[in-house]
Amino acid sequence: MASSSSSRLLFLLSCSVLALLAGAEVHHHEFIVQETPVKRLCKTHNVITVNGQLPGPTLEVREGDTVVINVVNHAQYNVTIHWHGIRQFRTGWADGPEFVTQCPIKPGGSYKYRFTIEGQEGTLWWHAHSSWLRATVYGALIIRPRENKTYPFEKPAREVPLILGEWWDADPIQVIREAQRTGAAPNISDAYTINGQPGDLYNCSKEETTAVPVKPGETALLRFINAALNQELFVSIAQHKMTVVGVDASYTKPFTTSVLMIAPGQTTDVLVTMDQAPTRYYLAARAYDSAQGVAFDNTTTTAVIEYDCGCATDFGPSIPPAFPVLPAFNDTNTATAFAAGIRSPHEVKIPGPVDENLFFTVGVGLFNCEPGQQCGGPNNTRFTASMNNISFVFPQTTSLLHAHYYGIPGVFTTDFPAYPPVQFDYTAQNVPRYLWQPVPATKLYKLKFGSVVQIVLQDTSIVSPENHPIHIHGYDFYILAEGFGNFDPKKDAKKFNYVDPPQRNTVAVPTNGWAVIRFVADNPGVWLMHCHLDVHITWGLAMAFLVEDGYGKLETLEAPPVDLPMC
């Protein structure tokens, strides 16, 4: 075991003392989930927002602070809110995934989320975790250092959250419901957005293009968040270099690049020095799409970096802003090179030895259509997705955490397989058809408190190989290695980075490849692990860990709040 109850107790006690000494604050917010008329792409739609804003409110806190958010649901749909990347030590009831840690907040209902930020600094975000509501229900969560503590890099002249999103010229909930009804893939989005705006390459969008004002010579901290539902994105700024200094609320060794690749769920902090001629420059994002023969939104969203220099400030000048060079949509080499550049800032102590050595396949599959029905998938099938051939089924009458806490039988089992039930050539061009249909089930994997967990995440070429952003709730992890083809423990273990691997909460598993992650199971509760392409979690590309309590109060899940929603 990597941690003992005494060391954990001392850590939490020291955190509590430091919080008192540093004057940690309690932040109270109210989120009203409501329908709001929003005009994009020449049309007005009533979309679900928080407090009538798109994106929603930015939460700004310091490490050690406590956050209390009262979420009131005035919308027509059930809703939950997930605080993406927050560790939620012992406060799993506040994590937010629907039917995992809570039942949804029904229309007319409310729920008060309460949690403390422990040992995290940087950029995270919050979003709905019910159906496809996060298409418009999302916002930034900025964690700054404690008072009298500085960033591990030069203090920026300004900080700007830049949230990448997707926009449907339709109700996203109805888009996914229609896909679930027919078994077909859902309609692709009609635009990408930056801070809620598509940018001036789209119809009826020029005047509202997001602008980032800067001064010549200054350095800005740009906090990128990929909130897109289903698309990894390349990002670049014309004629400007970006220095990456953080990802997923973890600092990194600074490295300079002209292009970012950010998967849904991930965040990337960059420093940009405004050292070019004082005029206007496009900041642009477009798809990185690794799946072969799969439709995707091949448009480009833009914002404008505007030097405060007396140059034109409207969006109709005779000379347009300079445009960046973006990679081709299928440029896996660029995506791979960017991921390889991310490292922890210092040598880290990798947890070990490994207690749980797991191997999970991830990928899309197909269900046979029921007799007498017509289905919209290939050859009259229904799309599905799975981990280790288990297509995850969310309960509907209670949450997994509630069932675990109260010992309610029949909701889940704890026999999720540690390895694929059938071993095969995972990345072969022609995978046998009998492997295409997974088993639908609600299976969890049980972990002892303090156990060291290593997972090989292996993409498969069933239907199509694809880059999968895999997110674990309640945990950060170290990415020890990534590669292509089938993972070979004898050969590929030699590639493990035991010195300065990056720490993240979401890993983009390479298309036709694998990633190896490691973490300590030191947070009791039920924690979802899933693909952050929402179409894939809808199809079942998910599982959950049940982490047992440790010893004593500080290693035990807290009791549920009195206002926890019931199903």
UniProtKB/Swiss-Prot annotation:
Pfam families: Cu-oxidase (PF00394), Cu-oxidase_2 (PF07731), Cu-oxidase_3 (PF07732). CDD domains: CuRO_1_LCC_plant (cd13849), CuRO_2_LCC_plant (cd13875), CuRO_3_LCC_plant (cd13897). One of its GO terms (cellular component) is apoplast. Residues 32-148, 158-310, 415-551 form the Plastocyanin-like domain. Its cofactor is Cu cation. SUPFAM superfamilies: Cupredoxins. Glycans are attached at residues 78, 148, 187, 203, 298, 330, 379, 389. Binds 4 Cu cations per monomer. Cu cation 4 binds at residues 468, 531, 536. Residues 1-24 form the signal peptide. Cu cation 2 binds at residues 84, 127, 532. It comes from the Eukaryota. Its EC number is 1.10.3.2. Cu cation 1 binds at residues 82, 471. It catalyses: 4 hydroquinone + O2 = 4 benzosemiquinone + 2 H2O. InterPro entries: Cu-oxidase-like_N (IPR011707), Cu-oxidase_2nd (IPR001117), Cu-oxidase_C (IPR011706), Cu-oxidase_fam (IPR045087), Cu_oxidase_CS (IPR033138), Cu_oxidase_Cu_BS (IPR002355), Cupredoxin (IPR008972), CuRO_1_LCC (IPR034288). GO terms for molecular function: copper ion binding; hydroquinone:oxygen oxidoreductase activity; oxidoreductase activity. Lignin degradation and detoxification of lignin-derived products. This is Laccase-3. It comes from Oryza sativa subsp. japonica.
